[in-house]
Amino acid sequence: NNFAVATTRGAFVCLLNNDIEIIDGEWLSELMRQACRPEVGAVGARLFYPDRSIQHAGVSVGMGNAAGHAHRGLPEGDPGYFAHALVARGSVAVTAACLVVARELFDMVKGLDEADLRIAYNDVDFCLKLHAAGLRNIYAPSAVLIHHESKSRGQDMAPEHRARYLKELATLQDRWDTTRFRDPMHHPMLDRACEAYRPVR
């Protein structure tokens, strides 16, 4: 991503995975509507799995002592916790599978950490850098796309993949203290281990 961004000349950049399917011609306009506001950092879309359940509706930092996708698996049309899945709102982080940000801000935080966070959590780290700089990251549900990421991704943990993941998890936890991080968008009485926003029992 950093290499690709370095070749661009536009005022804004869009990070977009190659497994994203565009289903609505207005998606980029909807993201730009938020990204051009001066107080905004990164803007992320509402992403569905091919079965139209939610893959991404913002990222909650501290979930699982790291970060998790809000409302993952929620059926299309279900508003989720206080309509979080359906309304534009602040989100401490959003996924880089589909993300728009001003090029100036991308450069300001030195882009994604592709050295210590080569695969996992580099987007969370990127958004946390923007958040720490006083910018507001936004989840924009009016931008809707399909993400052909397998629901079981991450369960395929060959020893070398698991070792890399654990190292990157430790980097995120050490850098941002995510084991104790209190996401202002995630009520303290909600279970930090659950992406479905269930109350603590």
Named regions from a protein language model:
Residues 16-18:
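Catalytic metal- and UDP-sugar-binding loop of GT-A-like glycosyltransferases, i.e.
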Residues 27-31, 85-110, 115-144:
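A short, conserved alpha-helix in the catalytic core of glycosyltransferases
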Residues 43-46, 140-141, 148:
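Short glycine/serine/threonine-enriched helix-capping/active-site loop
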Residues 1-6, 127-128:
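Short, conserved alpha-helix that lines the donor NDP-sugar binding/gating region
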Residues 41, 51-52, 63-91, 100, ...:
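C-terminal, non-catalytic tails of nucleotide-sugar-dependent glycosyltransferases
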Residues 13:
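Short aromatic/hydrophobic "clamp" motif used to bind/position activated sugar donors
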Residues 20-65:
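Conserved donor NDP-sugar-binding/catalytic core segment of glycosyltransferases
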Residues 10, 38-40, 135:
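Short, high-confidence coil segments that cap the C-terminus of an alpha-helix
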